[in-house]
């Protein structure tokens, strides 16, 4: 009898080692940090199906899943009180996470992709599951917001917000973002392609003497000229700020030091 009970105890112990994700804790799992400030618990042992159990809690919803890997990657799912579904997908190399909320019938409501560099893309969908809004936050904290979207490549409204709250407004057409700021007859435009490449230009509709500008991609510098003389450089830094520096009266060399533009009015003043 003792041997029998011992055998039963051993079997139960083995089952406990192979139990499902609902019982994961700090003793039988490892916590893995994934992009988005989330943690995924990964079982130390494989379950009866030869996979690692996964568990995470997102917005008070318990998500569960399994994976062939023990690094935290995989797909986890859970259900909210209103029966909508939450799905978390962690990339194999842990480089990004995709968090989705879906209706009970599977229609997507929202999606947020977070990369390791903390850049994010958040998308919202209408009742039919069609893309309607999208916000992209770069690693430097600047944003691109799209609304009134008809598909992934077209939006009636686009707003880019750089550091210091400086906003450029425009639209998204055929995958290219075109946003601008106007001051009098001068328009400062930023064009952003699908790969994130930025081109800055200036257009002046004045009837008399017009300002012109040349863009140097390698230094992200827009050199503005008037009456065939260079007047100032606008530099769009990688941290999301803009600086301005004036040329001497001859327009041959920069003088003083570059100053950070901290207000929209300061940028508009630089365009005058």
From Swiss-Prot:
Disulfide cross-links: none
GO biological process, one term: adhesion of symbiont to host cell surface via host glycoprotein
GO cellular component terms, semicolon-separated: cell outer membrane; cell surface
Signal peptide coordinates: 1-16
Domain of life: Bacteria
Lipid-conjugated positions (S-diacylglycerol cysteine): 17
Any matching Pfam family: Lipoprotein_1
Lipidation (N-palmitoyl cysteine): 17
Keyword NAD on entry: no
Membrane-topology descriptor: Lipid-anchor
Keywords, sorted A to Z: Cell outer membrane, Lipoprotein, Membrane, Palmitate, Plasmid, Signal
Main localisation: membrane
Location of this chain's protein in the cell: Cell outer membrane; Cell surface
Family: Belongs to the OspA lipoprotein family.
Protein name (Swiss-Prot/TrEMBL): Outer surface protein A
């Amino acid at each position: 009898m003792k041997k029998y009970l011992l055998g039963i105890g051993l079997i139960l112990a083995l089952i406990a080692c192979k139990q499902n994700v609902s019982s994961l804790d700090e003793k039988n799992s490892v916590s893995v940090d994934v992009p988005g400030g989330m943690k995924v618990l990964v079982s130390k042992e494989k379950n009866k199906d030869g996979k690692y159990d996964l568990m995470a809690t997102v917005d008070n919803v318990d998500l569960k899943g399994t994976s062939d890997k023990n690094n935290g990657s995989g797909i986890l799912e859970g259900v909210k009180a209103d029966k909508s579904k939450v799905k978390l997908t962690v990339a194999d190399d842990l480089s990004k996470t995709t968090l989705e909320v879906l209706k009970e019938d599977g229609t997507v409501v929202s999606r947020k992709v977070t990369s390791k560099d903390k850049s994010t893309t958040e998308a919202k969908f209408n009742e039919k599951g069609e893309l309607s809004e999208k916000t992209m936050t770069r690693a430097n904290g600047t944003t691109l917001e799209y609304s009134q979207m008809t598909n992934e490549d077209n939006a009636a409204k686009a707003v880019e917000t750089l550091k210091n709250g400086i906003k450029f407004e425009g639209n998204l057409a055929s995958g290219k973002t075109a946003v601008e700021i106007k001051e009098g007859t001068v328009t400062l435009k930023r064009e952003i392609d699908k790969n994130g490449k930025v081109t800055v230009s200036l257009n002046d509709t004045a009837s008399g003497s017009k300002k012109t500008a040349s863009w140097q991609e390698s230094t992200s510098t827009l050199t503005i000229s008037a009456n065939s003389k260079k007047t100032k450089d606008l530099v769009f830094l990688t941290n999301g700020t803009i600086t301005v520096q004036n040329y001497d009266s001859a327009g041959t060399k920069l003088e003083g030091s570059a100053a950070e533009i901290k207000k929209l009015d300061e940028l508009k003043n630089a365009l005058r």
